[in-house]
Amino acid sequence: MSGIRHIHGLGEFPRIFHRLMCESESIYLNANEHSRADVVVESREARFVADVVRRYPLHNYQRLARLLHRLRVVKAAAEIELVKRACAITQAGFERVAKFVKPGVHEYEVEAELAHEFIRNRGDFAYVPIIASGKNACALHYIANDQQCRAGDLLLLDIAASYANYNSDLTRTIPVSGKFSKRQRQVYDAVLRILRAQIKGLIPGKRWDQWQKEAEQSVEHELLGLELLTPRDIKRQDPEKPALKKYFMHGVGHPLGLDVHDVGLLKEPFAPGWVMTVEPGIYLPEEGFAVRLENDVLITENGTVDLMADIPVEADEIEELMSR
């Protein structure tokens, strides 16, 4: 099934490795590099690299990470199918908790419902879930999940499953009482418009920084419409600290795969086979809520494929789902 024709026991590794080293000149070694990782202890890979260089000091050693990152960011068909399966498990979990949530439920109860649904589908949490009601949603990585959901609040769910080591990444924001207030709906629809625009903007040849700038322009436009910013605010802002950053302070998306924040060469243009998250948000601590929405998107030569297109995201869809 794997295509691997010869399998050796671990006990044979030293002998085979020594023979290969004696016949080789250039050696590529991995150092488990990740832009989001700050490794403070010596890893197993680091110990292996140090031992190899000590034993074979005259070889030409090269860095493997950049090659691996380029390979990992472009997904093969089999990898895409695994991400799709993770997305399907995530959908089952989200639809379950959307029907479960009501005033008085605790955030940890929502987490428990998700754990049951993910595990019964042979999945697991892709990351520690963020189940943030009310003002908790204004903390980007709130994971206490210990508060009671109150009537009238919004509940931000940054929840997703992994399957066979491949991850999905979903965010939805739902009304605890089952209906959005007028103000909540205004902000929700604004974020949804940004999500739609940024999904369309994921095209081969575009770079991440350009895509991020487009997202910030969309956010700025929506903030003006919500009367959270004024034209005067825009005119007087420091270009290094744009006014919109008060309400949207993070990246609009990242590569997805074996890691939730997968390795990728974000200084290089998007290409077919990349899977990206798209996750705009507007955060309003003064009003006691935040809205973030997130889907996973495959970039192809002919446009984008929303891998979460079947997961309810329109406000009316959310309300209908919660009423069942």
Predicted features, each with a name:
Residues 1-324:
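Active-site neighborhoods and metal-handling regions in enzymes and metal-associated proteins
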